[in-house]
């Protein structure tokens, strides 16, 4: 007789194959229809006091999403959901950075030469259209990743009210005396024709000249030094800046020597100079650097005076100890010359070409002006080397790390121009500087990983004043009026507040569209004819750094609280958004805009190399979704240590898919074997059920603690190990007999099912933030015992901890089972047995014999566990001097359960016989 139909076999409609790529979009559509999921998450937590606000760092509204975008938004989604499922009120308003050079450049590429014929208003409208287009594209792409957010009400930095809030933040900083316009060298992108902030500069390898040039000291200076002739030898890597040389800097505290040949070097670097054959090394005179102050040298290019000055920035780690100083082309140069009231000369225009300043200031001889004016600086190096003649002691090329514009990818220069700066060291904030207060406030912020605080603090400690002005069209204007005559900037409250109102209504375009008289408040005391507009725009980092003000600190968005619970971005944002947000918030409100900062690394290929189209190693999130499913991308994030760079490739995604398959199969087994449970036991568990509940509690608590610290890969590693080693590897296997063969309401069967239900509930709650799709799907197929009152995943609540606590000394259990199956592998290989059910396990272990022997037999998956007798053994082993003996069962195989417990061949064992008889009663 075939007893298969008499068994309670597992049954579930939850599919084994996930078919993610096809089915995910359908479920996502349901989540996003009428903003269902996000609105439900808000509604479910109405009246809850504990909240979590993750403030979204805005990506650029330009281009399609790459894998880094996916990593960032999915990680945010997981963390927000983790707090939601813990019972907190959560808010996540996504946003976009809509201004700035990347968008303007894309518009220029489309326009080509037509740009010259367009007004600023027309250019700005085209930029707005471009940004709007990519906001919609990226929003759809983010939604296709299953990220839950307030997609119907995102924040856009180009909205009228938003531009007004950005400008309002600028005005607040100006009123505190922290804003200053001055001429100073700043990073300048000649390719973009604009100033850059530090955060907009990236470093790449660049080949440059390394040259040593001798400047003859004038006769009066030589006389003061008591020598017939002397030459100050400088080293530079920027020959093109030599026409603008105004000084030569020396370290006041270092010793300098004049060699027999008349060359001046730092004594500490003399050996290097000998190695270069500049000198034989014979010293004519030795002096301190301070003794050279205010002497004069002659620039060999133009015969202009170059003053010898002192500066602490002169180091002894290379060169000659004498530094070519052009105050228009370097920050150290600028500050050194400032002390001596030396003029800042800037002979380079905004496109990187020499201009008429060469003629006006006599920076090159008359006969060379036609050749150099209009020449790009980087094309001038070789010609300048020729013109130096004998003054050029050495010229060579070398490769070094050099600043490049982050958007044009062209090398930048230092160029002195009139710019607007937020001052870092003016003590205007309750007697403290912005630098001091920002560093002080950072102490209240928790960083993940902890090393982030040192990184951000170091950047704040060492950063210069923040250059916030840009010479472009697409951005929020630095909308100030200047008196034409006095050049004084008007910081009048009535004027500034009136402009805020205009921007709220009409947007910042009004600054270009309206005449001055229409921008002033009614009955203004200022005569519009005496005023002119400042036409610079704000650095986009000021835009994004003000988002806390416009989004969290205004009533315009239901976006959560200021200060935000968390800012979460890539590690590059220490120098970008984290820093700009900190400075603006501290300047205005004397506190940080965030309580926690979490950073993640960058995505690289499986070899750790940066992704690029040329290498063919780019992984697109759209392709991952199409080929594997978004759930695989989410699981990849959970399994990766995101505090460092994250490796991703097809091979890695295949491995993640295999892990997902195991998780899904475990869920399926739990659903299939609890489909008919009607009563959940919470107290009277069998030994094996207590054991799995104990192991579950340990794993769940470690996992939960790791998740609380956002150490997802650590937590997931423990969770997956529990699922594969304990739950699937042991427990679910050993439970099959009682689940399939015992009576439906048998206490042992109900005990096992109940343990599975309790584990499934907690497992689903732990997985819901990361594998939201899978858990939502699983709940549709789950018995009410598992899902309780949940209609979908957004009804779940993850209660802290796991209340089912049991203490079982399982060391002997584990060790003996491992050894037993090690021996069984050999017995099966040698074809001595086909199944462990053919066996009895004999032991002298009281620890095992004192328990329910049916349970212990299930633990080893044998038919009987008993005391050791004289029966012949197939194998023997010892664990901690406790004997175990494997013998063939003396009973017969039960045709229903296959255990060797039947007294006669072909007959049912007592258990199966009882179950079948009960059905017929």
Swiss-Prot record:
Annotated Zn(2+) binding sites: 894, 897, 909, 912
Catalytic reaction annotation: tRNA(Ile) + L-isoleucine + ATP = L-isoleucyl-tRNA(Ile) + AMP + diphosphate
Domain of life, per lineage: Bacteria
Broad enzyme group: ligase
HAMAP family named among the record's database cross-references: Ile_tRNA_synth_type1
Compartments it resides in: Cytoplasm
Placement of sequence motif 'HIGH' region: 59-69
SUPFAM superfamilies linked to this entry: Anticodon-binding domain of a subclass of class I aminoacyl-tRNA synthetases, Nucleotidylyl transferase, ValRS/IleRS/LeuRS editing domain
Residues the entry annotates as binding ATP: 613
Main location: cytoplasm
Cofactor(s) for this UniProt protein: Zn(2+)
GO CC annotation terms, alphabetical: cytosol
Matches recorded under CDD domains: Anticodon_Ia_Ile_BEm
Listed Gene3D superfamilies: 1.10.730.20, HUPs (3.40.50.620), Ile-tRNA synthetase CP2 domain-like (1.10.10.830), Valyl/Leucyl/Isoleucyl-tRNA synthetase, editing domain (3.90.740.10)
MF terms in GO: aminoacyl-tRNA deacylase activity; ATP binding; isoleucine-tRNA ligase activity; tRNA binding; zinc ion binding
Protein name in UniProt: Isoleucine--tRNA ligase
Assembly with partners or alone: Monomer.
Residues engaged in binding L-isoleucyl-5'-AMP: 569
Cited function: Catalyzes the attachment of isoleucine to tRNA(Ile). As IleRS can inadvertently accommodate and process structurally similar amino acids such as valine, to avoid such errors it has two additional distinct tRNA(Ile)-dependent editing activities. One activity is designated as 'pretransfer' editing and involves the hydrolysis of activated Val-AMP. The other activity is designated 'posttransfer' editing and involves deacylation of mischarged Val-tRNA(Ile).
Gene Ontology biological process terms, A to Z: isoleucyl-tRNA aminoacylation
Free-text cofactor note: Binds 1 zinc ion per subunit.
Family: Belongs to the class-I aminoacyl-tRNA synthetase family. IleS type 1 subfamily.
Keyword Transmembrane: no
Motif mapping: 'KMSKS' region: 610-614
Domain remark from Swiss-Prot or TrEMBL: IleRS has two distinct active sites: one for aminoacylation and one for editing. The misactivated valine is translocated from the active site to the editing site, which sterically excludes the correctly activated isoleucine. The single editing site contains two valyl binding pockets, one specific for each substrate (Val-AMP or Val-tRNA(Ile)).
Enzyme Commission number(s) from the entry: 6.1.1.5
């Amino acid at each position: 007789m075939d007893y298969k139909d008499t068994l309670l076999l597992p049954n579930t409609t939850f599919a084994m194959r996930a078919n993610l790529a096809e089915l995910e979009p359908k479920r996502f559509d349901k989540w996003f229809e009428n903003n269902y999921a996000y609105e439900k998450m808000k509604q479910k937590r109405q009246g809850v006091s504990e909240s979590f606000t993750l403030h979204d760092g805005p990506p650029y509204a330009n281009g399609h999403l790459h894998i880094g975008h996916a990593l960032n938004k999915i990680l945010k989604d997981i963390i927000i959901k983790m707090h939601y499922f813990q019972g907190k009120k959560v808010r996540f308003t996504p946003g976009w950075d809509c201004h700035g050079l990347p968008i303007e450049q894309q518009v220029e590429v489309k326009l080509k030469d037509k740009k010259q014929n367009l007004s600023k208003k027309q250019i700005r409208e085209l930029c707005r259209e471009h940004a709007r287009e990519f906001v919609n594209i990226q929003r759809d792409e983010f939604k296709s990743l299953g990220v839950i957010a307030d997609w119907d009400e995102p924040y856009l930095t180009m909205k009228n009210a938003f531009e007004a809030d950005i400008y309002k933040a600028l005005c607040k900083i100006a009123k505190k005396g922290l804003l200053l316009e001055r001429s100073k060298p700043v990073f300048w992108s000649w390719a973009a024709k604009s100033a850059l902030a530090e955060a907009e500069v990236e470093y790449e390898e660049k080949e440059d000249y390394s040259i040593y040039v001798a400047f003859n000291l004038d006769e009066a200076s030589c006389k003061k030094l008591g020598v017939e002739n002397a030459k100050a030898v400088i080293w530079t890597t920027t020959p093109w800046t030599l026409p603008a040389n105004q000084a030569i800097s020396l370290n006041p505290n270092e010793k300098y020597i004049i060699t027999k040949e008349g060359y001046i070097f730092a004594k500490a670097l003399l050996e290097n100079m000998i190695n270069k054959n500049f000198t034989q090394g014979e010293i004519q005179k030795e002096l301190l650097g301070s003794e050279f102050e205010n002497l004069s040298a002659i620039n060999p290019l133009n015969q202009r005076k170059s003053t010898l000055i002192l500066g602490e920035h002169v180091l002894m780690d290379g060169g000659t100890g004498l530094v070519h100083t052009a105050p228009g082309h370097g920050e150290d140069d600028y500050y050194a010359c400032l002390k001596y009231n030396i003029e800042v000369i800037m002979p380079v225009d905004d496109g990187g070409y020499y201009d008429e300043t060469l003629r006006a200031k006599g920076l090159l001889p008359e006969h060379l002006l036609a050749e150099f004016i209009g020449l790009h600086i980087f094309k001038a190096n070789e010609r300048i080397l020729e013109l130096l003649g004998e003054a050029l002691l050495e010229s060579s090329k070398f490769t070094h790390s050099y600043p490049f514009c982050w958007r044009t990818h062209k090398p930048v220069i230092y160029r002195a121009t009139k710019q607007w700066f937020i001052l870092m060291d003016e003590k205007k904030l309750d007697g403290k500087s912005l630098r001091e207060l920002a560093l002080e406030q950072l102490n209240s912020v928790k960083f993940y990983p902890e090393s982030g605080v040192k990184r951000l603090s170091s950047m704040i400690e060492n950063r210069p004043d923040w250059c916030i002005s840009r010479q472009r069209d697409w951005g929020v204007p630095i909308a100030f009026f200047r008196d034409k005559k006095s050049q004084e900037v008007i910081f009048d409250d009535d004027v500034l507040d009136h402009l805020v109102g205009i921007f709220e209504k009409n947007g910042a375009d009004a600054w270009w569209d309206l005449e001055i008289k229409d921008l002033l408040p009614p009955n203004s005391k200022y005569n519009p004819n005496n005023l002119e507009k400042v036409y610079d725009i704000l650095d986009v980092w000021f835009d994004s750094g003000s988002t806390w003000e416009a989004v969290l600190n205004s009533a315009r968005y239901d976006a959560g609280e200021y200060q935000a619970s968390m800012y979460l971005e890539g590690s590059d944002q220490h120098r970008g958004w984290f820093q700009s947000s900190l400075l603006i918030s501290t300047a205005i409100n004397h506190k940080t805009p965030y309580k926690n900062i979490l950073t993640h690394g960058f995505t690289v290929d499986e070899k750790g190399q940066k992704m690029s189209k040329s290498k063919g190693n780019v992984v697109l999130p759209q392709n991952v979704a199409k080929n594997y499913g978004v759930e695989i991308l989410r699981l990849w994030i959970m399994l990766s240590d995101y505090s460092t760079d994250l490796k991703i490739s097809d091979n890695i995604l295949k491995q993640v898919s295999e892990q997902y398959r195991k998780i899904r199969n475990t869920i399926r087994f739990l659903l299939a074997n609890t489909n008919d449970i009607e009563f959940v036991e919470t107290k009277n568990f069998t030994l094996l059920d207590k054991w799995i509940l104990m192991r579950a509690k340990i794993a769940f608590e470690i996992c939960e603690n790791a998740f609380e610290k956002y150490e997802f890969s650590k937590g997931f590693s423990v969770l997956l190990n529990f699922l594969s080693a304990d739950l699937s590897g042991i427990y679910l296997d050993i439970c099959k007999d009682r689940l399939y063969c015992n009576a439906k309401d048998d206490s042992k069967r109900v005990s096992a099912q109940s343990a599975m239900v309790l584990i499934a509930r907690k497992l689903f709650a732990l997985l819901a933030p990361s594998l939201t799709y899978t858990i939502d799907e699983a709940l549709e197929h789950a018995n009410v015992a598992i899902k309780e009152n949940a209609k979908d995943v957004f009804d779940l609540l993850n209660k802290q901890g796991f209340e089912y606590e049991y203490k079982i000394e399982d060391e002997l259990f584990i060790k003996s089972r491992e050894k037993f199956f090690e021996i069984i592998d050999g017995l099966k290989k040698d074809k001595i047995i086909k199944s462990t059910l053919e066996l009895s396990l004999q032991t002298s272990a009281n620890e095992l014999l004192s328990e329910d022997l049916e349970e212990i037999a299930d633990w080893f998956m044998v038919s009987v566990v008993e005391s050791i007798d004289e029966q012949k053994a197939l194998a023997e082993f010892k664990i901690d001097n406790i004997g175990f003996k494997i013998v063939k069962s003396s009973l017969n195989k039960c045709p229903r359960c296959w255990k060797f417990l039947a007294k006669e061949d072909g007959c049912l064992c007592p258990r199966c016989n009882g179950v079948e008889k009960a059905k017929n009663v």
